[in-house]
Amino acid sequence: MDAHIASGTFRLGFIGMSNAGKSYRSRKLSEEKGFLWYQVDEEIQKAFGFSDRGQISGWLGLPAAPEYPEREKKYLELENECTRHASMRTDGKNFVFDTTGSVPHLEPETLDILRQNCLLVHLDVGEGKLERMMEKFFEKPKPVAWCGHFFVRPNESQNEALRRCYPELLKTRLAKYRELAHLTIPAQDVFDTSADETLAVIRSYLRE
């Protein structure tokens, strides 16, 4: 790791739940250590011609909407393209890859390329945080890529289906992040840390 950092060839990818700290850690590495920060969300936003991520959410909508399946398909195709492209980038400097929450649902070939070209660090929020994430979602449901994890049963309302399916989506993603990552680090271990402190934590887990 240190040899790669010194030669400007270190390639780090953060994966994990929304609000786990992926973007904050990436920004710190960019500002304090000069890493090239690649934000998949931002690249998707640009490709769609939206001015902010809120517009992506508004366009994608909730899963019961008739236009949702086709829009989700377009979103995931673009995410897959951006992720695969960035995984193979070489820009002559250290690189931090800020992935989306839906990254484990991408094509297996793309995930293989990502794993082969980056040290994937999962910022793990832990099962204990899932309940709060569910509460926040139901306070103000926001569009997400459901990736086949949403369906409405007979005589079930959309809200009831969301309440049944969303916890399963989170649990599935958490398991997939852990399976995909080279290292799983509790998100709290790098909470509010500097770039050097973040790298030191990653280094300590590599030595275990």
Predicted regions and their residues:
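ATP-dependent small-molecule kinase phosphotransfer cores
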Residues: 42-112
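Post-Walker A helix-loop "phosphate-sensing" segment adjacent to the P-loop in P-loop NTPases
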Residues: 31-40
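ATP-binding Walker
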Residues: 20
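Pre-Walker A (Motif I) flank of P-loop NTPase domains
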Residues: 7-12, 92-93
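A glycine- and Lys/Arg-enriched "phosphate-lid" helix/loop adjacent to the NTP-binding pocket
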Residues: 117-173
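NTP-dependent small-molecule kinase module
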Residues: 1-9, 28, 32, 160, ...
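P-loop (Walker A) phosphate-binding loop of NTP-binding proteins
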Residues: 17
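Walker A/P-loop
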Residues: 23
